[in-house]
């Protein structure tokens, strides 16, 4: 685990890094824009690539999905493809030459992901989605709403404990 919490102070203005209220309700560009953390996936993926090269790994994985494309620019297919190309150039000659970025859910909805995870026995009670933080999911933020809907659409029981 790499502690990058200090970077959040530099990326102020987001509900995820600052004292800005997390919007409630469903995902919509007008209310979820405040949850954008500029360049967050590029930052985390750059660190992951550095670690992968140091460990001689052949894969860096990320879990961006189709539902994030319209709100978060660094979750779009064009970003993922360009980032992989950039990193291949950045680490050329170091580590495993087959190192690549793996984004298996890039074109999948949350419901499709939940269905796949259900079939694989993913311990969903141990996963986290809520933007509010805390001990339990709030059930009101966009990610909690999408989580509940994804389980319902996938026909998979939702083991999540919600506050409300």
Each language-model region and where it sits:
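Short cysteine/histidine-rich zinc-coordinating motifs and their immediately flanking basic loops
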Residues: 142, 150-159
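Local cysteine-cluster metal-coordination motifs and their immediate loop/turn environment
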Residues: 46, 126-149
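ATP-dependent adenylation/nucleotidyltransferase module used to activate substrates
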Residues: 1-121
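Short cysteine/histidine-rich metal-coordination sites, predominantly Zn2+-binding motifs
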Residues: 133-134, 155-164
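Short, intrinsically disordered/low-complexity patches at protein termini
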Residues: 95-96, 149, 161-163
């Amino acid at each position: 685990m790499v502690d990058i919490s200090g970077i959040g102070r530099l990326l102020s203005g987001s509900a995820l890094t600052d004292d800005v209220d997390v919007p409630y309700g469903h995902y919509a560009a007008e209310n979820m824009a405040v949850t954008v953390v500029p360049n967050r996936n590029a930052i985390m993926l750059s660190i992951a690539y550095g670690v992968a090269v140091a460990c001689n790994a052949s894969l860096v994985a990320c879990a961006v999905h189709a539902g994030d494309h319209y709100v978060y620019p660094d979750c779009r297919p064009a970003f993922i493809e360009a980032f992989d190309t950039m990193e291949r150039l950045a680490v050329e000659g170091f580590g495993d030459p087959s190192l690549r970025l793996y984004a298996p859910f890039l074109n999948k909805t949350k419901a499709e992901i939940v269905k796949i995870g259900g079939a694989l026995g993913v311990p969903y009670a141990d996963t986290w989605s809520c933007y509010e933080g805390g001990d339990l999911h709030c059930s009101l933020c966009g990610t909690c709403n999408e989580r509940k809907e994804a389980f319902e659409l996938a026909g998979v029981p939702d083991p999540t404990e919600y506050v409300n």
